[in-house]
Amino acid sequence: MAGKTYGLLGCGRIGIHTAEAAKALGMHVIAYDRYPSQAAKDLGVEFVELDDLFARSDVLGLQMPLMDFNTGIINKENIAKMKDGVIIINNSRGQMVVEQDLADALNSGKVACAGLDVVSTEPIRADNPLLKAKNCIITPHMSWGSRSSRQRIMDCTVENVRAFLAGQPQNVVNK
């Protein structure tokens, strides 16, 4: 992957961690974010306009929450702006992708492959066109779920229960 360009659609906390990993692989990282962070700039992330992101990315990662402006943003019009053979990774929100358009692009070879941890309807429907698309890997919204991540959640839960039982509840939202 060295020398390739990783494009981030969204560069908040998760996007910054993704950028660090991409840079460790020798990739150049560009991003589109309506609110570019200084932390990302300090890491060397180059912020670009949306059309530049689509045109320059060898790998495009979706890393932002679902909003009106990005619902269906991965569609045939924007896929046409992308490099032939682009790789698309979505572990953000399934509704950001027009699934039939992505399936068509995968089957034609315009998109080389896609790694999707989310789809528009979960659990995935049997008639989802991505299930029959070439070079498409779909996981059940579990990309965060490494063994160490699950262990941290269990440890935090135990500590929160202990604190509650000791009369010192943590992370109270209705004080």
Predicted regions and their residues:
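Glycine-rich NAD(P)-binding loop of Rossmann-like domains
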Residues: 1-17, 44-46
